């Protein structure tokens, strides 16, 4: 009996370690999006490899998450627009160089607060059916709990680390902040600058970070992840609320236009 108990403990600890080591950044239990159905989506790339999502908010500006490029020192940052497949030739695809990388000044590696990043493209994006701007929320109000919102990305889709070549998406219901702040969930760490969505085995995380949480055709939030394990219903997905940063976003883009 003692040997069996010890064996069970070892299995539990091993399972816990494996879960902790599994890659964050996956759209879990999503599905492939219809081709070019989300023409605002951007692939933020470093040295030619996808690292995060993003979305086009102005002809020369892409929104993403600050922690996406925290560990990038000398890498070449570029943005791919007009893509459904990351690897296959598509007439609409174009890779843009980045002129400026502007993380929110309050962003820090040890926290997910202020987790926003603006990327100024070296030239204006060529708009068309597969490349479009996404309106973003400027009115400072909370999205009603239960509202179904869309998230999309190219993050890994399984615990084995398999990466999709084509854009994936899923719908997630918004969770009210009070519930998200319960001790059993995020224990009071969710500020008014953040919002949550349910994550019961369906979720997005770091590999999809920077992509938009789209509610009613408007970007309400930006995907962030922190250190949580994705797909855990006790750790709802966390998103940066764009409406809390209108002045900063407008100011950065105005400064870029004047440069």
From Swiss-Prot:
Record keywords, A-Z: Complement alternate pathway, Disulfide bond, Hydrolase, Immunity, Innate immunity, Protease, Secreted, Serine protease, Signal, Zymogen
Record field: catalytic activity: Selective cleavage of Arg-|-Lys bond in complement factor B when in complex with complement subcomponent C3b or with cobra venom factor
InterPro entries per UniProt: Peptidase_S1_PA (IPR009003), Peptidase_S1_PA_chymotrypsin (IPR043504), Peptidase_S1A (IPR001314), Trypsin_dom (IPR001254), TRYPSIN_HIS (IPR018114), TRYPSIN_SER (IPR033116)
EC supergroup of this enzyme: hydrolase
SMART domains linked: Tryp_SPc (SM00020)
Disulphides: 52-68, 149-215, 180-196, 205-230
Principal place of residence: secreted
Modifications the protein undergoes after translation, according to the UniProt entry: CFD is activated by the removal of 5 residues at the N-terminus, named activation peptide, by the MASP-3 isoform of MASP1.
Prosegment residue ranges: 22-26
Residue span, Peptidase S1 domain: 27-254
Residues the record marks as site: Cleavage: 26-27
Region of interest called Self-inhibitor loop, as start-end residue ranges on this chain: 224-228
Subcellular localization: Secreted
Family note: Belongs to the peptidase S1 family.
Record remark on domains: The self-inhibition loop inihibits the serine protease activity in absence of factor B (CFB) substrate.
Protein name (Swiss-Prot/TrEMBL): Complement factor D
Species whose genome carries this gene: Bos taurus (Bovine)
Gene name for this UniProt entry: CFD
